[in-house]
């Protein structure tokens, strides 16, 4: 209930130990995190950070209250309208006119062009899945960041994309289902990367010759219908361990390893097809997490900092074994012109900041009231992104993406 939530916030505030920084009361734990971890190896001093935050709060905290009050006023007017018109036939034109009058709707303006610069291709030109993950959980955040490249074979075998009959159900590996997975993968290649005069179902090998993909059926050689879809390979050109193709700015990697278990049923020795999948991920500080005090917020901020620095790790135990999860490296290939080629190994990470409504006891204003949590998020998450702007492991254009 709302009362319990409020009580939780009050208890959190009572448990905080504060230190005075200028006119702010800052949680000692948060202050230590910012000064010792967040700002380390950046060009921002702790003095500039805290004075800048205070100056921003002086200007925007009152504005934040005004916006919340405006929203409350809008909601009351809308509630009153519905009460007044209860039981009447709904008239869309009248309702729209009312919403325009109170400022809830605005008349559409003239056409405009987005002029934002330094936008990564994952935002500007690649259409692909976007994940949302609670940044408070390091393991989940790492899983999402690493979901840029995923196995098509695993995805097909372990889900109901391919219907599983009762006769083929087995706790052990089901070779019949394995054949269906391979068939699905070949049909997928035929659909998006068709060969001139041959189905992928009938190939026996592939190689790279003079910067072009050559697909073999015995001694016969075939080409892609669209040779521009071939991007590069890994391994020896005569017997590559992987080839990389591209369609609609999304890559797939065809792995060849005749020794792999998955390749035992495959007459071409293909062991898997890896799809470029979650091209971006929102690391969420709001709806999917419950961070009510400095201790909670530091967990969120520290995980985001680790993602931006590229050193976030998570250890966990599964079936009696200890595992460590970390960020995947970038993927290296040989391009079709014989040069080195690197592709991004993980999702482009965005960070979602808390909205206007919530406050947090991690920092108290000069009047003793709690800081608007969204402003605190904005300062700390962007400060964390300074580490990536310098190294460009997440955004290759030197940008940080804030979801509000």
Enumerate the predicted regions with their spans.
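N-terminal amphipathic/basic-hydrophobic helices that include classical n-h-c signal peptides
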Residues: 1-13
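N-terminal-proximal low-complexity accessory segments that begin disordered
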Residues: 12-106, 114
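Catalytic alpha/beta active-site cores
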Residues: 12-17, 94-97, 101-404
